[in-house]
Amino acid sequence: QIQRDGFRAARRAGVKMVFASDAGVMPHAEVGRQFRIMTEYGMTPMDAIRAATRNAAEALGRESDVGTIAPGRYGDLIALAGDPTADVTLLANVPFVMKGGGIVKDAR
């Protein structure tokens, strides 16, 4: 409850949330659970997605080349079986990934 209250208080105060993956406290395959947790704590699915993309790029000072889809930026993409803005848990098990123009995962 303390973590949830702190998360909500930070959001109310205008703190920009960023999805993190390098804490080293959970197995890599479990990192996608953060999307579900963020929405349980009050974020919309799209806000949670932005935390993992645009906000993370801004936090790293890389917003000019990653974090959003735009001409001249790196275009790594994923494909899902449904709409993650309707079911954010889809992002915990991504079946298809393209990186640098090539397919790096295809579990469809």
Where do the model's predicted regions map?
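Small/polar (Gly/Ser/Thr/Ala-rich) solvent-exposed segments
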Residues: 86
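His/Asp/Glu-enriched, well-ordered alpha-helical/loop segment
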Residues: 1-83
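Extracellular/periplasmic ectodomains of large secreted or surface enzymes and adhesion receptors
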Residues: 107-108
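Short aromatic-centered micro-motifs
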Residues: 97
